[in-house]
Swiss-Prot record:
One Pfam family linked to the record: Cpn60_TCP1
SUPFAM superfamilies assigned to the protein according to its UniProt record, in alphabetical order: GroEL apical domain-like (SSF52029), GroEL equatorial domain-like (SSF48592), GroEL-intermediate domain like (SSF54849)
PANTHER family linked to this entry: 60 KDA HEAT SHOCK PROTEIN, MITOCHONDRIAL
GO BP terms in the entry: protein refolding
Location in or out of the cell: Cytoplasm
Record-given protein name: Chaperonin GroEL 1
Entry binding sites for ATP: 30-33, 51, 87-91, 415, 479-481, 495
Subunit structure: Forms a cylinder of 14 subunits composed of two heptameric rings stacked back-to-back. Interacts with the co-chaperonin GroES.
GO molecular function annotations of the record: ATP binding; ATP-dependent protein folding chaperone; isomerase activity; unfolded protein binding
Catalysed reaction equations from the record: ATP + H2O + a folded polypeptide = ADP + phosphate + an unfolded polypeptide
Gene: groEL1
Class of the enzyme per the UniProt entry, highest EC level: isomerase
Top-level taxon of origin: Bacteria
UniProt keyword annotations, A-Z: ATP-binding, Chaperone, Cytoplasm, Isomerase, Nucleotide-binding
Amino acid sequence: MAAKDVKFGNDARVKMLEGVNVLADAVKVTLGPKGRNVVLDKSFGAPTITKDGVSVAREIELEDKFQNMGAQMVKEVASKANDAAGDGTTTATVLAQAIVNEGLKAVAAGMNPMDLKRGIDKAVAAAVEQLKELSVECNDTKAIAQVGTISANSDASVGNIIAEAMERVGRDGVITVEEGQALQDELDVVEGMQFDRGYLSPYFINNQEAGSVELENPFILLVDKKISNIRELLPTLEAVAKASRPLLIIAEDVEGEALATLVVNNMRGIVKVAAVKAPGFGDRRKAMLQDIAILTGGTVISEEIGLELEKVTLEDLGQAKRVSITKENSTIIDGAGEEAMIQGRVAQIRQQIEDATSDYDKEKLQERVAKLAGGVAVIKVGAATEVEMKEKKDRVEDALHATRAAVEEGVVAGGGVALIRAASKIVDLEGDNEEQNVGIRVALRAMEAPIRQITKNAGDEDSVVANNVKAGEGSYGYNAATGEYGDMLEMGILDPTKVTRSALQFAASVAGLMITTEAMVTDLPQKESAGMPDMGGMGGMGGMGMM
């Protein structure tokens, strides 16, 4: 086991604080409408230019191991804020830096770190309650666009495209961000349920121009197994042919004789039919087949529950207004399922999302909710160069997370104003002893840090602005983009309550741990191993002459 280097007390805290400040100073220059860019060197390809706080934080590793521990702990603040709300990473970093700096001054002056932490926690809990009271619902498109604009560093086009996407697919719809091919941003919306499985044979195509299969008012047969024997399908095909309507078969697979017979029947016009593979794999496939069944009002034919393919009736089949199938995707539009059943299924999947532990599972479950409840929107980010594309895509993703958070918990006045107002309402809060009171004051002072940093980045005097805003009431604040004072809500400068709340809570949580640190342990650097020993002077080798 390698030898360790240990530092105690003030020596440890000073080193840790140096690391905190290096990382926070690099991140905080990005805060606000006039925040600066940070250029990140990459081991391959062009450097990345970003204004995304968490992207900057993730790149920072310091050579001094004690400093690096401090930096990594603040990095954790940014990552946690990003995971919880998807935005507010820079605000969280600025708050953590302020709490650590103020808190360690108090520790150096002889205060008890544990009581300081209790005071900080007490102030933060009270401030969070005040933020919830200040929160205003965010339901209309204009407010959503404003939140997106602020989060995308005052880029109105980003705010507008996100608001349009949310309006078209609903609050539960899935919105994804991709790199586009054009210079302008584009929005593609897929209504209905789309899954990534195309037609099993090109002979099903009936729209030659588009190269797709279009079925109007079809029956939909859902089967949880492979179909290779056509005899199993004959009763269904006969019933559908009598009804003079097309049929879509969604099964684990359709192969051999069964597929060949379907193709021949389709080409001869006996019955209009198409077949696709069921989406997903394993248990996820079973769940998605059940989703499609509920959406279309059908039943999944599965031997597990005693249903046989030969005994299928028209009542077992789902229905939809239209189905469109391309080489890669199938889309079911306007399924005939009952609304109450669909909502029940959505509620069930939402519960699974809450219980899920992995991000991948949550994402897949969220996609299923969207396919049942709304639709899927794809924002294609346009830019002139690859470097600009990466930077803009980061901003669009941040803005999207911010708008989702705003719809979830509402909005508060932006520009650091909400934290100032929350702090002013708990100024009389008292702890159990004087040291806890100092902790409360540390937290209250730290809550001014975001507005001060936004002002500094805009090139203005932070003390003047902070005092002017503190003298005001409600959503009165400072618009750093224009240099004007006024009502932040009316000016459209909004922050999602969830983002502000998460930033404060995570900053206080990690900063509290750092203030109460008394010792730090790290590996000693390994000494370089010595080279080969000199061979001169080895006994018995004197007679060896060099040529």
